[in-house]
Amino acid sequence: VAYGRVDTCSMLENAVAHINNFRPNVEAVIITGDITDRGELEAFHVFREIINELVPPWYVVPGNHDSRENFLEAFKDCYYLKNGSDFIHYSVDDHPVRLIGFDTTVENKPYGFLTEERLLWLDNCLTEKTQKTTILFQHHPPFCTGINHMDVQNLINGKELIQLLTSHRQVRH
């Protein structure tokens, strides 16, 4: 239950049922963070109980409400999270398009920020496979959305990300 009043569990259960019944079949589900309200491990476990009912594979990155430590504990069995980095980013080539999950979070802060290390990782990852269409997913948008209370929590250096992406044609934006 988020914010003490919204039954997010029922909403997630309904979404999972809808995705599982969707035709044509959904090939993958991308989850871009804020899985929990306050980062509690128990909340991650509740999420896992529900999301494990999904038929298609699912891929997840943390949001600013998610504790990195508890996130990694809750998803330690997800093969794609085994990158050995301090940040939670990865690439998956199991689909017709390449998926890159990218960690934009700053622990205990609402906004996102990409260190040079993270930007270099992404640049190297994108340079590896230039011919395969790629979907990059992350929690914080790199641009203003027009939602004022969200735009103050955006990706602080989003322009740097957009600049990097312009040199990689396989990521459409």
What are these regions (language model features)?
Residues V1-V46:
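N-terminal active-site segment of His-dependent metallophosphoesterases
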Residues K129-T145:
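Short acidic, glycine-rich surface-loop motifs adjacent to enzyme active sites
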